[in-house]
């Protein structure tokens, strides 16, 4: 069996258009120290008081930043990430909690989802961290966060079911914390984290339907699952691929592969995204041909689908997953990058209140949230829009986009125990060592 991997820091250097996008995102967002401080502050003041999701911003951006560092090895970026990790560690309560929800309203709404992103942000940082001492502190923080959750969520007496920690989408958002727990088990090898992962998997990711069993049976397409929020559903299957690595039960890999196969058959559009009804799966392989001025093709979905495909590629080596990443990257993903410095003054930033919503002015973001499939204007609305302090605001897609750019970079070339595979037509230089010999691969390409 071939053991596939992507680049480690320093091996790969992309050039041309891909590098332009990487440098733009790094300068515009990932080295903005004020933005990082603002994200961490949401945990210190518990700013999500009414079921919001500002707690996802830090971890989503951190994951993308770490993947960007792996693909580009920008040392200024690394220093900024060390600084924000230190800041986040200072936000941890004595109990182990790191949450934007106050304790008296915890484990509701998006709380588990946001905790997932804190853990994932730290876990991805561990993959680039150069300090053994800092690594130990981060792992200790992760264990405290996870143990706090395990003590309160589960099947035991006086515990809350994970499917009761959110009333949204069958609690798929909460169940997607699986990936974080499996990764933590992979680092610590402490059994309780794998046991908690098994508890999540055994529940099937939703209060309303066992998504794993449905994917194994292929009786329904994902848009027929009932809870059809694409991003959260895909995030659960990302966790399942990680779970498979340790339990080695082929049915879990098969479920994830079937899920992607069914998505591609029923909900994969010409630009490589899914869902033509806002952020929902809706048989968009077909519905993409219907004219619509509504928002659709969410950037969060594009990136998450790319990440899921990259995980399945590393497990299987199947080139079809690279075909999917290629379509998504060169169309929906790159098209969503605001590298032309649009002001976004006409992009709606909606703040919802009891009797409706109102719009607020906001800064331009590095990524658009949605992509039209007809001749139309981009940037109609900010996805997951949240107002914070200091006159600043942000959104979910603005945070996740950097991961999509980085995944496209890393997918360019892979190594395995038998050689190398050039997967995407990008300009790059790749240097590594193979069987004691120095290897250099170079490609000069024009993406478009």
Predicted features along the sequence, with ranges:
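Glycan-recognition and catalytic cores of secretory/periplasmic carbohydrate-active enzymes
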Residues: 1-448
């Amino acid at each position: 069996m071939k053991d596939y991997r992507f680049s480690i820091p320093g091996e790969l250097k992309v050039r041309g258009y891909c590098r332009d996008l990487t440098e733009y995102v790094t300068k515009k967002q990932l080295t903005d120290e004020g933005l990082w401080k603002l994200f961490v502050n949401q945990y210190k003041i518990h700013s999500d008081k009414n079921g919001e999701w500002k707690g996802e911003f830090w971890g989503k951006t951190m994951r993308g930043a770490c993947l960007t560092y792996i693909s580009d090895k920008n040392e200024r970026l690394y220093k900024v990430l060390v600084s924000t990790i230190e800041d986040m560690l200072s936000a941890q309560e004595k109990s182990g909690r790191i949450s934007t929800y106050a304790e008296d309203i915890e484990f509701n709404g998006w709380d588990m989802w946001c905790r997932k992103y804190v853990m994932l942000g730290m876990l991805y940082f561990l993959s680039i961290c150069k300090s053994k001492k800092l690594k130990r502190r981060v792992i200790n923080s992760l264990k405290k966060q996870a143990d706090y959750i395990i003590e309160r969520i589960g099947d035991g007496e006086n515990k809350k079911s994970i499917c009761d920690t959110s009333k949204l989408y069958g609690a798929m958002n909460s169940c997607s914390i699986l990936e974080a727990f499996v990764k933590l088990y992979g680092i610590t090898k402490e059994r309780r984290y794998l046991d908690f992962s098994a508890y999540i998997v055994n529940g099937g990711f939703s209060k309303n339907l066992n998504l794993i069993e449905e994917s194994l049976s292929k009786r329904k397409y994902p848009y027929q699952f009932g809870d059809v929020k694409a991003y959260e559903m895909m995030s659960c299957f990302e966790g399942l691929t990680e779970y498979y690595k340790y339990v080695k039960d082929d049915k879990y890999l098969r479920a994830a592969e079937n899920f992607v196969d069914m998505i591609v058959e029923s909900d994969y559009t010409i630009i490589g995204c899914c869902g033509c009804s806002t952020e929902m799966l809706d048989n968009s392989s077909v519905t993409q041909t219907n004219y619509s001025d509504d928002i659709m093709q969410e950037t969060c979905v594009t990136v998450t689908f790319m990440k899921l495909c990259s995980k399945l590629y590393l497990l299987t080596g199947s080139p079809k997953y690279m075909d999917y990443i290629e379509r998504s990257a060169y169309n929906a993903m790159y098209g969503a990058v605001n590298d032309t410095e649009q002001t976004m003054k006409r992009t709606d930033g909606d703040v919802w209140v009891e009797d409706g919503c109102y719009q607020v002015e906001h800064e331009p973001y590095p990524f658009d949230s949605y992509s039209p499939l007809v001749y139309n204007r981009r940037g109609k609305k900010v996805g997951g829009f949240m107002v914070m302090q200091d006159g600043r605001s942000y959104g979910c897609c603005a945070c996740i986009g950097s991961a999509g750019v980085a995944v496209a970079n890393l997918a360019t070339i892979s190594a395995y125990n038998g050689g190398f595979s050039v997967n995407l037509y990008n300009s790059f230089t790749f240097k590594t060592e193979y069987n004691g010999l120095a290897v250099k691969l170079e490609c000069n390409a024009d993406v478009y």
